[in-house]
């Protein structure tokens, strides 16, 4: 089977690939473009002053033909988990990385980590595989294997430079998300962990739309204890409920500071309104646990090492492992 490295052209101008061969756009898409494949193409507010309006209105509409292909490609994955946060900076991607390391520590599990933070990908750096490339064969795209039983996929692997910016609007993001779901050869996985950007944006709407038929186990929501983070988490939970996404539970990250020397713990971000646990009781969702802040987590993330393996006795490690057990119980895996 022949393979070749995925070219950076894949991430340069992908919009045209979602159009039928006989159509072409006259101008770049405007901000808030619903995408030429959308039911709202040519009808949305953003379309009214767009030069492509007539083209998009004339495109054939109907069920997305890629969704059955996505469902088939993901049929070998037992559990699909979205990692969400209402606000950036709460450690969502860091927790996604630690969750992936923790699950793959079980040699009997096959794990995939998919980075959907398209404009700010960070999983490859934290997993220690930034120098790897994605290969394409006649069966599809091969993800990068961090370990024998841990595969990763990110746009970062396809960028010409580590610090290259991805300046895309919704429809370009949608195309890449489709490719990650339809064309990546994930094979049989026990878990696919999906890291998403903060908030409720195009990526969240698209991943839910494209994966709904294949079955999403649910969302793991990450927050920090202070009220300003909880305010946005409430919006994230509201989004999940309106979108029909099951909420597996909430993790309170950075709930205290652990001194690496004395192992003493002190509060950095005070839970002024009761923190994540109180929020879970109020909203009737499962509280998966609290994870304290250990400064060595940042160092391990920077160096692409597993904090759980490097510091197995840290209170943060023990807390993460407890959360993983609660999560596995929530999806019926233990």
UniProtKB/Swiss-Prot annotation:
GO MF annotation list: 4 iron, 4 sulfur cluster binding; ATP binding; ATP hydrolysis activity; ATP-dependent FeS chaperone activity; iron ion binding
Compartment(s): Cytoplasm; Nucleus
Cofactor note: Binds 4 [4Fe-4S] clusters per heterotetramer. Contains two stable clusters in the N-termini of NBP35 and two labile, bridging clusters between subunits of the NBP35-CFD1 heterotetramer.
Keyword list, A-Z: 4Fe-4S, ATP-binding, Cytoplasm, Iron, Iron-sulfur, Metal-binding, Nucleotide-binding, Nucleus
Record-linked InterPro entries: Mrp-like_CS, Mrp/NBP35_ATP-bd, NUBP1/Nbp35, P-loop_NTPase, YlxH/NBP35
Cofactors that this protein relies on: [4Fe-4S] cluster
UniProt subunit comment: Heterotetramer of 2 NBP35 and 2 CFD1 chains.
PANTHER family: CYTOSOLIC FE-S CLUSTER ASSEMBLY FACTOR NUBP1, NUCLEOTIDE-BINDING PROTEIN NBP35 YEAST -RELATED
Function noted in UniProt: Component of the cytosolic iron-sulfur (Fe/S) protein assembly (CIA) machinery. Required for maturation of extramitochondrial Fe-S proteins. The NBP35-CFD1 heterotetramer forms a Fe-S scaffold complex, mediating the de novo assembly of an Fe-S cluster and its transfer to target apoproteins. Required for biogenesis and export of both ribosomal subunits, which may reflect a role in assembly of the Fe/S clusters in RLI1, a protein which performs rRNA processing and ribosome export.
Protein name, UniProt field: Cytosolic Fe-S cluster assembly factor NBP35
Biological source species: Candida glabrata (strain ATCC 2001 / BCRC 20586 / JCM 3761 / NBRC 0622 / NRRL Y-65 / CBS 138) (Yeast)
Taxon lineage: Eukaryota, Fungi, Dikarya, Ascomycota, Saccharomycotina
């Amino acid at each position: 089977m022949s393979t070749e490295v995925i070219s950076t052209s894949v991430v340069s101008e992908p919009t045209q690939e979602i159009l039928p061969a006989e159509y072409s756009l006259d101008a770049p898409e405007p901000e808030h473009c619903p995408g030429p494949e959308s039911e709202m193409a040519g009808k949305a507010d953003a379309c009214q002053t767009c030069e492509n309006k007539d083209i998009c209105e004339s495109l054939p509409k109907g069920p997305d033909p890629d969704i059955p292909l996505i469902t088939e490609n993901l049929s070998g994955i037992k559990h699909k988990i979205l990692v969400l946060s209402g606000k950036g900076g709460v450690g969502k991607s860091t927790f996604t990385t630690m969750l992936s390391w923790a699950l793959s520590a079980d040699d009997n599990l096959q794990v995939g980590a998919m980075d959907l933070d398209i404009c700010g990908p960070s999983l490859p750096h934290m997993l220690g595989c930034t120098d790897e490339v994605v290969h394409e064969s006649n069966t599809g795209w091969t993800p990068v294997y961090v370990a024998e039983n841990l595969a990763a996929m990110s746009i970062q692997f396809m960028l010409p430079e580590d610090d290259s910016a991805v300046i895309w609007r919704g429809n370009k993001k949608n195309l890449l998300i489709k490719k990650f779901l339809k064309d990546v050869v994930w094979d049989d996985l026990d878990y696919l962990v999906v890291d998403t950007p903060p908030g409720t944006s195009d990526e969240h709407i698209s991943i839910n739309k494209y994966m709904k038929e294949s079955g999403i186990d649910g969302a793991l929501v990450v927050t920090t204890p202070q009220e300003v983070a909880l305010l946005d988490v409430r919006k994230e939970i509201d989004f999940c409920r309106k979108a029909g996404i099951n909420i597996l539970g909430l993790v309170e990250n950075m709930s205290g500071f652990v001194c690496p020397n004395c192992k003493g713990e002190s509060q950095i971000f005070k839970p002024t309104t009761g923190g994540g646990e109180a929020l879970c009781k109020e909203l009737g969702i499962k509280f998966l646990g609290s994870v304290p802040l250990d400064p060595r987590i940042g160092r391990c993330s920077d160096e692409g090492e597993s904090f759980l393996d490097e510091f197995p006795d840290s209170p943060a490690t023990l807390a993460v492992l407890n959360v993983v057990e609660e999560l596995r119980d929530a999806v019926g895996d233990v």
